[in-house]
């Protein structure tokens, strides 16, 4: 398992690090709270 940073779609801020399996081919997308936007936004896995 590796820690993957998640970026906010709205502002691009890196807010979370989540564990992910190494062999997974799909990119992770989660709806999480962004303190900079002060709202729940979609966060996508960064490279």
Curated annotation (Swiss-Prot):
GO terms for molecular function: structural constituent of ribosome. It comes from the Bacteria. Keywords: Ribonucleoprotein, Ribosomal protein. PROSITE patterns: RIBOSOMAL_L33 (PS00582). Coiled coil: none annotated. Belongs to the bacterial ribosomal protein bL33 family. NCBIfam families: PRK00504.1, rpmG_bact. This is Large ribosomal subunit protein bL33A. It comes from Staphylococcus aureus (strain JH9).
